[in-house]
Design a protein with these regions (language model features):
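Bacterial signal peptide processing site
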Residues: 25-27
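Short helix-initiation/N-cap motifs at beta->coil->alpha
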Residues: 62-90
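Bilobed "Venus flytrap"/periplasmic-binding protein-like clamshell domains
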Residues: 31-72
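Alpha-to-beta junction loops
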Residues: 32, 55, 76-79, 93-100
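Bacterial N-terminal signal peptides that target proteins for export
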Residues: 2-11
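Active-site-proximal beta-strand/loop segments in catalytic clefts of secreted hydrolases
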Residues: 36-39, 83, 102-103
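A ligand-binding cleft/hinge motif common to bilobed small-molecule-binding domains
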Residues: 88-113
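C-terminal motif of bacterial Sec signal peptides marking the signal peptidase cleavage site
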Residues: 19-23
């Protein structure tokens, strides 16, 4: 059940973020900053999303709840920046990409299914 929920949550976030994340850091001279929620549950989901998108590698021992310390490799030149979840929409301009929960994305006009 938990595995399926995390997979669905990551897929929903992936739908919102794929275009922005796919080009992150490929030729950037400075790291591209990616905003992620700073609370444990949502940060784990964001890390799994970034792993699924092929931007980072995570220690398999972390399972379904990885933390930033579990990131073993950055595939691209990115920097993961923990930020209060409810401010990620209003700080979009501060980051190259953000992983935003539907709870905050939808009221801001971001549609996860598009």
């Amino acid at each position: 059940m938990k595995k399926n929920f995390i997979k669905k949550a990551a897929t929903a976030l992936l739908l919102v973020s794929t275009l922005a994340l796919s080009a992150c850091g490929k030729k950037a001279s400075e790291p591209v900053k990616i905003g992620v929620p700073d609370d444990g549950t949502n940060q784990s989901r964001a890390i799994k999303l970034l792993e699924t998108a092929g931007l980072i590698e995570v220690d398999p021992a972390a399972g379904y709840t990885p933390e930033l310390k579990d990131v073993t490799k950055y595939i691209y030149n990115i920097e993961i920046v923990p930020t209060t979840a409810n401010t990620l929409t209003s700080t979009l301009g501060d980051y190259g990409a953000s992983t935003i929960n539907g709870t905050y994305a939808i009221p801001y006009g971001l549609v996860p299914s598009k």
